[in-house]
Amino acid sequence: MSTETLERKSVQRKPMPLYKVLLHNDDHTPMNYVIEVLMKTIPKMQPSKARKIMLEAHNGGVAVVIVCALEHAEFYSESLNRHNLTSTYEPDC
């Protein structure tokens, strides 16, 4: 009886592309509400980080909330939109 060794082909997986979830400023939503929604929507979002994102969007017009896989970016952006915040997502180049 002979023993034959099969070679396993090396498969290199490409890393999944990442997407930025963006929060756009609006002048009507209370700042505390934006902070609250960010903390409820994004896992492990700390109040200080949520406040920083809110202020960046308020002062600069837009802020990056999180960079993640497409499926998560879609979910987070849609969740922010459901809470009457303006959010989009785009590839992270």
Swiss-Prot record:
InterPro entries assigned: ClpS, ClpS_core, Ribosomal_bL12_C/ClpS-like
Signal peptide interval: none
One Gene Ontology biological process: proteolysis
Domain of life: Bacteria
Role according to the record: Involved in the modulation of the specificity of the ClpAP-mediated ATP-dependent protein degradation.
Subunit structure of this chain's protein: Binds to the N-terminal domain of the chaperone ClpA.
Family membership: Belongs to the ClpS family.
Protein name: ATP-dependent Clp protease adapter protein ClpS
